[in-house]
Amino acid sequence: MSNTLSFKTYSAKPGEVVRKWYIVDAEGKVLGRLASEIAKVLRGKHKAQFTPHIDTGDFVIVTNAEKIGLSGKKMDQKTYFSHSNYPGGVRIDNVKDVLQKKPEQVIEKAVWGMLPHNNLGRQLFKKLKVYKGTEHPHAAQCPVEMNVN
C-alpha cells in the first residue's frame, strides 16, 4: 500500500512556464476545427503542466486567414450580430462579406468563443496573431509548424 499523502497536485507558477510559438496555415482548413485546436494551444491544455487558473499556453500565428473554409452552407447562412447600443444600431454581417473585408476577424471571433470570457481569457487571446496572406512579422521567434487535421 502506497502513501497517498505524499502525492501533491502540481500547480504551474507563471514565471516557470516556457512558451513556444506555433504557426498554422489556415488554407483549406475548416473554421471550427481549426479554432478549437488553436484554443487548446492558447490555453495550454496540450502541456502536462496545465493549470486552469494560470496562463500556461503558447503563442499561435495563423496565416492565410482569407482562405479558411466553412462546412455546409455556412458561407451563405452564417451571420455575425452586433449592436451599437443606439436605437436602430443593429448590424448583421454575413460571413462572406466579413471574409472579404477583414478575414482575420472570422478566425478571431471563432477562437474567442472557445476561450474563457474573463481576465484570463483576454490574456490568452492576446497570444493569437492572425494575418491575411503568408507574410508575418514573427520570424525572429522561430515558430514551429502546428499540425491541424
UniProtKB/Swiss-Prot annotation:
Pfam family, one: Ribosomal_L13
SUPFAM superfamilies in alphabetical order: Ribosomal protein L13 (SSF52161)
Entry's Gene Ontology molecular function annotations: mRNA binding; structural constituent of ribosome
Coiled-coil ranges per UniProt: none
Ribosomal protein as UniProt keyword: yes
BP term (GO), one: negative regulation of translation
Keywords: Ribonucleoprotein, Ribosomal protein
Signal peptide positions (record): none
Acyltransferase listed as a keyword: no
Family annotation (InterPro entries): Ribosomal_uL13 (IPR005822), Ribosomal_uL13_bac-type (IPR005823), Ribosomal_uL13_sf (IPR036899)
NCBIfam families: rplM_bact
Role played: This protein is one of the early assembly proteins of the 50S ribosomal subunit, although it is not seen to bind rRNA by itself. It is important during the early stages of 50S assembly.
Protein name per Swiss-Prot or TrEMBL: Large ribosomal subunit protein uL13
